[in-house]
Amino acid sequence: MSTPDDRHHSLPRRRFLAASGAVLGLGALHALTGTAASAAETPQWRPGVRFAPARNWINDPNGLVHFQGEYHLFFQHNPDGDQWGNMSWGHAVSPDLVRWQELPVALEPDELGEIYSGSAVVDHHDTSGFFGGQPGLVAIYTSAGDTQQQCLAHSSDRGRTWTKYEGNPVIPNPGVQDFRDPKVFWHAPTGRWVLLLAVGDRIHVHGSPNLRDWELLSEFGAGHGSHGGVWECPDLFELPVDGDPGRTKWVLIVSINPGGPAGGSATQYFLGDFDGTTFISDGAPDEIRWVDRGADFYAPQSFSDVPDGRRLWLGWMSNWDYAEEIPTDPWRGSMTTPRQLGLTDTGDGVRLVQQPVDELAAVRSNRRAWRGVIGTGRSPEFSGTSLEVLATFQPGAARSFGVDVFAGGGHRTRIGYDVAAQELFVDRTGSGTALISPAFPARHATPLAPTGDRLPLRIIADRSGVEVFAAGGRAVLTDLVFPDRGSDRVHLFADGGNAAVEVEVFDLTP
């Protein structure tokens, strides 16, 4: 996990969520806090379908796991303030990845230090010996005191209460500064648990039969990918290519801060093979593959034990360049919409693809649709502040085309495609409250070569952020925005010529 100071030097990190039994999702601020909104509070920016805590600071998602009918989201949280510090594990649960209930803080600092990022697993066969032969939840996290060390906690009551292991730390610090963010999963072919650890700008792989006794197996990272900042929050999982179970690749996820393509923090990935001991990348050492080229997708983690086998994840929707300055109150920080992952073969090789989870369709309402030509004459206008937009464009002679969201009062967030540059972009320079930091107002873009005469866009515009998925999720941009009150219009645009479009717009109402 990163800290605000990782831009200059590396320090330990911390965690999140306030204790509340309220169901989050509609931005019902009074129900969440039990108090009247003050003039400083900003309910207009509380996400509708993305998770945000009732109050105070959050950053990285931690311990994502499904167990006994619930998705668990733990997260870095400061229960006592809206700045990074006093890191604890906040906790929320959901039956469907859309409607979240915030629970009391799960893990608090102790004599070993603050509670930094980590993961959680279901110990189905009680390999740890914590559960008397029954399944239970085990959290693996970094304790950050004088040094960073890896520790365990376990729960026998569906994650409601936790007992820290008396033998902590299970992986002591070997004398390095950055030694954190354990990600654990069961590797069936070798019959053992595997743990990934971010160590400086490397990933260490450990193995264990019981979650308590760990052996260092291998190291990855020298000369591979981006080393513009400290490496953090690793993840590793296997995915089929284009859904073919006979053709799979392992995906290694590494977040870095700083060094991202949009400035500040970002997440890269590597494709390759993993035999339970060693990850071998199949890409050129100097090749850098970014998960998301927007500014605000960091430290993603995937869920363990998803019942139908999908690989699902979410990330922290912020950037360390300005995370402590975003203008929301009484909370600071939110997560992205959960996404489902896949691999697809493109003209440039196999690439990671992302789409919002299928569960999001259940909260669609108020469908509006239009088909026609834009660029000359009047185009349709829609409205809303928590929306899903599905648009398929045929460019025609247009030089650029796309969708403006959160428009009105001279402001807009422009999402579009530049035909000549062959790039998808989000322009938030005119999005409203932009001057929270010199790094904030910007245009972010990602390469996207055309694959035919149509470009499908899927946009989640949820009150204080946009998530854009193009061409089946081959190109993704995630950006925070803070529109002014009344900036709730959606327009289609085409510059330099006409473009044909088919569009559907849905309200998102959990």
Predicted features along the sequence, with ranges:
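Beta-rich carbohydrate-recognition and catalytic domains
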Residues: 39-182, 186-231, 240-293, 317-370, ...
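Residue-level detector of intrinsically disordered/flexible regions characterized by low predicted structural confidence
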Residues: 32-34, 61, 469
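N-terminal export signals
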Residues: 9, 15-35
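Beta-rich accessory regions
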Residues: 245, 273-287, 291-510
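Juxtamembrane helix-loop transition sites at the ends of transmembrane segments
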Residues: 4-5, 33, 492
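N-terminal secretory signal peptides
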Residues: 1-11
